[in-house]
A protein has these predicted regions:
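Alpha/beta catalytic cores of nucleotide-metabolism and tRNA/nucleoside-modifying enzymes
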Residues: 39-42, 46-47, 58, 159, ...
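Active-site-adjacent beta->alpha loops and helix N-cap segments on the catalytic face
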Residues: 83-89, 139-162, 211-223, 269
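Active-site beta-loop-alpha junctions enriched in small/polar residues
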Residues: 51-53, 78-80, 108-110, 135-137, ...
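Alpha/beta enzyme core
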Residues: 120-130, 134, 139, 160-211, ...
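Hydrophobic faces of well-ordered beta-strands that scaffold small-molecule active sites
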Residues: 46-49, 73-75, 103-107, 130, ...
Length: 354
């Protein structure tokens, strides 16, 4: 085993060498870290964080097939609306819509009754895992004690989690949370409760809910939680390069894994690059993104009933985070155009010049 491991590291280092000689300065610094990593690193599993409106079943299927490198995908949270589960949420977690990938469905609920309603759907669909969202920072939901808005109320968190675990001893529950809604200490006040409960893992994004995605991540706040947490802990937040991942795993060596959302939407190859220890070339990236785009476009064309306008709107969101360093003029056209033909030619230009 150790001999194979050494051979694998040597192979990864050999793959890096040409980039040191011919790569630009960004590639060279990435590669130096990759070589260091290949010699020292314990590669952690990468999980794909859910983003409402972006990482639906269509996107997940295409990403898993074309890029891969992801151990687990999470569905955007399933929630109750007007007393019932939103139909599109139920469709999104259908096992038939998520073949050949490991999906953990996520839910958001302000109380045990609503949670129970959603859990019955998960169980009906055959899921044995569920992620409970205590991290969503959107004020409309948070004000009603959903997601991150529940963190200042330890009794409510306790009632929600204890009830779920008592009613479903066979389900492996995980929790995704932030440091707090208003104060970073909110998560620390909950830590004795978390440590007591039989959770599969915890995902922590080291920001406050009221920050949304603004400002810096608070690594000291993360560290305070990390030191006392007895469950497998996953880090989430502001990871855009393989270097970013490595600096976090070096600082927090006991992490069980890494969860990435926006960083993977911007660079869908990020998990792959981290795992193989080499960046993929611009040509390879353009080719793979082209395949991803074609697959997602064709799937939406078949699914959506609202004609060209609806399809265009959906595809514009596909580009919101993707390839931020791509041609600016082409990106502008993609977001401004109201014609499908102009959109398609702007996509070709963007990929052709990448």
């Amino acid at each position: 085993g150790s001999e194979m491991c050494i051979r694998d590291r040597a192979r990864r280092i050999r793959k890096c060498i040409p980039f040191l000689e011919y790569g630009d300065s960004h590639q060279r610094s990435e590669v130096k870290m990759c070589i260091f990593a290949a010699m020292n690193e314990n590669i952690l599993p990468i999980h794909f964080a859910p983003l409402q409106g972006y990482t639906d079943a269509v996107y997940r299927r295409a990403h898993a097939r074309i890029f891969g490198g992801i151990e687990t995908y999470y569905s955007p949270f399933v929630r109750m609306e007007h007393g019932e589960i939103r139909r599109k949420d139920a469709r999104d977690i259908e096992p038939d819509n998520n073949p050949d990938l490991h999906l953990i469905p996520q839910l958001i609920a302000p109380d045990a009754d609503k949670l129970e309603h959603i859990m019955s759907l998960f169980i009906e669909k055959g899921y044995q895992e569920a992620d409970i969202n205590l991290g969503c920072p959107f004020p409309m939901l948070a004000r009603r004690h959903n997601g991150c808005g529940m963190l200042p109320y330890p009794e409510e968190v306790k009632a929600l989690l204890s009830e779920a675990i008592d009613r479903h001893p066979d389900i492996r529950f995980s929790v995704k949370l932030r440091l707090g809604w208003e104060q970073a200490e909110e998560c620390l006040a909950l830590l004795p409760l978390f440590n007591e409960l039989p959770l599969a893992h915890i995902i922590l994004h080291p920001r406050l809910g009221k920050q949304q995605y603004k400002g810096e991540v608070d690594l000291e706040g993360f560290e305070a939680f990390y030191k006392e947490c007895t469950h497998p802990l996953f880090y989430n937040g502001d990871l855009h390069t393989a270097n970013d991942i490595r600096s976090i795993t070096t600082r927090f060596p006991r992490l069980a894994g890494i969860v990435i959302g926006r960083g993977l939407l911007a660079n869908p190859a990020l998990a792959l690059e981290y795992k193989q220890g080499t960046p993929i070339s611009s040509d390879e990236m353009a080719k793979k993104v082209g395949q991803l785009h074609t697959e997602v476009f064709n799937a939406y064309q078949e699914l959506l009933q609202g004609g060209e306008a609806q399809l265009l709107m959906k595809m514009k969101s596909f580009w919101e985070y993707l390839l931020p360093d791509g041609d600016r003029k082409a990106r502008k056209t993609i977001h401004k155009t109201s014609k499908l033909a102009n959109y398609q030619s702007a996509v070709s230009n963007l990929l052709g010049t990448y």
